[in-house]
Amino acid sequence: PGQAPGSEDAEFRKASFVTPRAIIKGSSARLPHLALNEHLTMEVARRSGMPAARTLVSEDGLALVVERFDTDAQGHPVLGVEDFCSLLALRPAEKYDTTWERIAQSLRSYVPAAQRAKQLETLLQIVVLNYVVRNADCHSKNVALIYGDAGDVRLAPVYDVVTTVAYTGFR
């Protein structure tokens, strides 16, 4: 992962609202059509066979609703989720300060041996997806492990994938 130019600027930030069942992301004037961009990019992931968070775009196109994959229909947590920023003991401001190799090494440490090869393959698919859709803003907070029943540790469905090349400063 590498930091996209301008991604930490205040003018690139957008409002987000978390509910028990969804994450609602607002738009930014500097990133036009971001909700539609993310929705379509997530559809590419889903249609390629990758587990991906489900998304919907508001009628006015200004908001994206991301269905949470860690809660049940009533909004109760059913899965533990931990992103690689946390797993690598990085502060949120350091989310770009790692490599895919370090993420893979961390994955090997947390995922049981029986699931490891499949999860490393999934990690490779995530890397390829972000390359193919030209997402220059993939970082360690956008890749996570989910914890289900005892011994069930796997990569979370992909989320927060955007074709950033559509925006000046993210090329």
Predicted regions and their residues:
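Conserved kinase catalytic-core segment
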Residues: R30-R46, T99-Y167
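Conserved ATP-binding subdomain of kinase catalytic cores across diverse folds
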Residues: P1-D97
